[in-house]
């Protein structure tokens, strides 16, 4: 059964940005809470609970994307990297193509429709073949050169130090 979130509007209004602290620096992502509300709520819940702290980017394909969010990449975890999740899944929110997979989008990874949980990927380049398949729930602002520099420097097994969902960039 898919997990659904019932987040009060005043709380959803604070889910504006994800601050992704990596071993290479900070990536700021603007969240699309109006277009993918359940996905953003799930990501915010996991981030605010510390789920992502200490994980790794376990799959990085140059010229495509960097994927993280698997708990099996945590120090001492026993499962295979890329196969773990939070213990639940969420439905895809891909009915509309408001946000194509351009460079710098964050999107839910999944093993098939409605199987996403905690794993996400950030695209290095436009990936239109993923439009309508994976839920885009945020993006790096196009003028945020620092975040793009950090994204471009990410390699496999780089650390996700922490992820916070915040109201404002600071």
Feature map (PLM): residue ranges:
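Cyclophilin-like peptidyl-prolyl cis-trans isomerases
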Residues: 1-170
